[in-house]
Regions:
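N-terminal metal-binding scaffold of metallo-dependent hydrolase/deaminase domains
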Residues: 1-43
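Conserved acidic residues
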Residues: 3, 46, 91
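Non-transmembrane, interaction-prone segments in cytosolic or luminal domains
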Residues: 9, 16, 22, 26-27, ...
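Intrinsically disordered, low-complexity peptide-like regions
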Residues: 11, 48, 60-62
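Active-site metal-binding motif and surrounding structural segment of the metallo-beta-lactamase
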Residues: 39-56
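Metal-associated gating/positioning segment near the N- to mid-region
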Residues: 52-96
């Protein structure tokens, strides 16, 4: 079992009513626990990331995307455009027609 703790980040989750500093524990790529800063009990070997001063949020949705296919794949492909979005924290995109 792999464990990762993100410590002290400003967690923003409007659906859960959370807006403030938290520690988040992930086990096997799933959220296992959310606690006040410094309150997580970690097993030996757990990786930790210091997120103080950073925002931690669920995946973002880009509601206005123009992917360049078909017709302008030399500028950007669906694969490169969605990879760039994922690198920026976007887990969903709403594509617009590019005419």
């Amino acid at each position: 079992m792999t464990a990762l703790a993100i410590r002290g980040g400003h967690l923003l989750d409007p659906a859960a009513g959370v807006d403030g500093p938290k520690d988040i524990l992930f086990k096997d790529n799933r959220v296992a626990e959310i606690a006040a800063p410094g309150k997580l009990k970690l097993a030996n070997g757990a990786e930790t990331l210091d997120a103080r001063g950073l925002v931690v949020a669920p995946g973002l949705v880009d509601i206005h995307v123009h992917l360049r296919e078909p017709g302008q794949g030399y500028k950007e492909t669906i694969a490169t455009g969605t990879a760039a979005a994922a690198a920026g924290g976007f887990t969903s995109e709403i594509g617009r027609a590019h005419v």
